[in-house]
Amino acid sequence: KGRPVTVKFSPGIYQLDRAKSSQVLYYISNTTSELDDPDPTKHIGLYLNTLKNVTIDGCGSTLLMNGEMTSFVLDKCEGIVLKNFNIDYKHPTQTEVEVLEEGNDYLIVQVHPTSQYRIVDAQLEWYGDGWSFKNGIAQSYDRISEMTWRSWSPMENLLRTVELRPNVLYLQYKEKPQVGLHTIFQMRDSFRDEVSGFVNRSKGILLENINFYYLGNFGVVCQYSENITVDRCNFAPRPGSGRTNAGFADFIQVSGCRGMIDIKNSRFIGAHDDPINIHGTHLRVIEFLSDNR
């Protein structure tokens, strides 16, 4: 009834499975079009709908997404606080490999342990619950300079893949560029069919002291909402994980919102696009009802 309520988690790791998620259809700005994704149903881990004056205190807990998922949704809510927890993914939809050896027509790469692969007809395929890809987009990362570039993908012109041992692969090419030892490739497909978090038609929202160790297929999208604060949040790979990438594209996307958008005391590392993006919302007219409607 709108009276303030605080929900506290017992510290620990809470695995949220795609198969058991809340499945709700949402149209979200800057995500995959209906041509590529005719069913934009989101698979939601933490779902708050039409709630008022609720605080979710994770008390240091981790919400671990298992599968391609939207970690949280706040829909038509007011006065909501999410604080003191971590968001991570068991098998991030961006895979990573490090070059151990290079020849004129081959690479030997170390696969990050969170990246699942299979070899089908000598071709390499990455996969998880609800997703897979064989081609896609890549960026390359240099640990020494800590620089990342949009780059050639080790999935291009691939003739065959051989597993030398678990998580070590021999990749043979028809042709390839010189890439350099210990280059790390961050690979993904181009489909933004889920987001990390979604704040929709809500107001007075605070995200506080949250570690976003991985941000799904898109960042936290705030759409048609009002007065949002992001304070002391960390958007970066989990320390000690060995991962170098934390997100598909933008980390925070603010679309068609109003009031005060206050992002402060926060850290952004490892995005494949902008850390913060604020803009209007493109809407396609599908029907004219009358001269004034």
Feature-to-residue mapping (PLM):
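Long amphipathic alpha-helical scaffold regions
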Residues: 225-260, 289-292
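Long, low-complexity, polar/charged, intrinsically disordered or flexibly structured peripheral segments
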Residues: 130-201, 206-216
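Autoprocessing Asn-cyclization modules and mimics
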Residues: 88-146, 277-293
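Short, solvent-exposed linear motifs at loop/edge-of-secondary-structure regions
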Residues: 45-59, 260, 265-291
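All-beta strand scaffolds that present successive hydrophobic residues in beta-strands
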Residues: 9, 55-58, 79-84, 181-182, ...
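Acidic Gly/Asp/Thr-rich repetitive segments characteristic of extracellular carbohydrate-active
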Residues: 1-8
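Extracellular beta-strand-rich solenoid/capping regions of secreted or surface-exposed proteins
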Residues: 15-55, 64-83, 91-105, 191-202, ...
